[in-house]
């Protein structure tokens, strides 16, 4: 079933602005103490789940490195990387998410740039601008990934790295209500899944709320194969559970990849 909906970027911008107002987990800024520890070299950031990303996936010394936190607003990863010495740009679709980064930067005296936009269009940046793109779990909010990978490849310098977190697409097989409310794994959806094609606007409003963000599953071909097709070389793979999802006792809910732009 498919209905006419607003552009997903516009819809999800409003949804995430609301999440910030509600205090969503991924919209809670790091503390001043976290920033101070990062300045002293004691820091960690999350790419998938709640586990710190493997520090070997990032440059040993971040000082002077140009880092793009892609679809990564909320005042979490960007400020920590800036405190660790990187030149950070946070790019996000939600003004309020970016506002969290701006707040931390002002509070703690960090140099940090924020840019509003859709992750599929990075035309705000020139070719070979960044050394690292840090892209935590967020591409479930756009329907197509090929533009994301093409743009990431373009804006990275040769030898630059792309760190990506994404949902295991199998999570979308299951009935959301049965899973979230009763912990039951009931297969009801065909993959790849989309809120837009699976439910009408009225059904979405009933099941998730009219203001909930639109989500899209993506195949592993789109996630990993898409990076390879864009020109990246895959050098790392990790997985993690979803701490509050009943399916975690049977499978990993998150994957992470590390890829390099040759050169």
PLM features: what roles do these ranges have?
Residues 146-161:
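A short glycine-rich, Lys/Arg-flanked "PGG" loop and its adjoining helix->strand segment in the class I
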Residues 29-65:
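Conserved alpha-helix/loop element of class I SAM-dependent methyltransferases that forms part
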Residues 230-232, 246-263:
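Core SAM-dependent methyltransferase catalytic element
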Residues 65-121:
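Class I SAM-dependent methyltransferase SAM/SAH-binding core
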Residues 161-202:
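Conserved class I S-adenosyl-L-methionine
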Residues 131-146:
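A short SAM/SAH-binding and catalytic strip from SAM-dependent methyltransferases
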Residues 120-133:
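A short acidic, Gly/Pro-enriched loop at the edge of an enzyme's catalytic core
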Residues 214-237:
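Short alpha-helix
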């Amino acid at each position: 079933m498919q209905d006419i909906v607003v552009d997903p970027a516009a819809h999800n911008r409003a949804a995430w602005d609301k999440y910030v107002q509600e205090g969503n987990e991924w919209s809670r800024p790091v503390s001043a103490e976290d920033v101070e520890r990062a300045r002293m070299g004691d820091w960690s950031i999350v790419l998938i789940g709640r586990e710190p990303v493997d520090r070997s996936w990032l440059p040993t010394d971040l000082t002077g490195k140009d880092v793009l936190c892609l679809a990564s607003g909320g005042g979490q990863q960007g400020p920590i990387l800036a405190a660790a010495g990187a030149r950070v740009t946070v790019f996000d679709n939600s003004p309020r998410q970016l506002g969290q980064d701006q707040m931390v930067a002002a509070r703690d005296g960090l140099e940090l740039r924020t840019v509003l936009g859709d992750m599929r269009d990075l035309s705000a940046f020139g070719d070979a601008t960044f050394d690292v793109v840090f892209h935590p779990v967020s591409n479930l909010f756009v329907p197509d990934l090929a533009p994301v990978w093409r743009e990431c490849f373009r804006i990275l310098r040769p030898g630059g790295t792309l760190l990506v977190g994404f949902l295991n697409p199998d999570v979308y097989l299951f009935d959301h209500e049965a899973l979230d409310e009763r912990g039951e794994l009931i297969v009801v959806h065909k993959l790849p899944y989309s809120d837009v094609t699976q439910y009408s606007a009225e059904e979405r409003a009933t099941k998730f709320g009219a203001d909930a963000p639109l989500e899209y599953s993506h195949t592993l071909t789109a996630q990993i194969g898409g990076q390879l097709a864009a020109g990246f070389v895959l050098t790392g793979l990790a997985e993690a559970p979803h701490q509050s999802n009943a399916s975690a006792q049977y499978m990993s809910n998150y994957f992470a990849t590390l890829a390099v732009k040759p050169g």
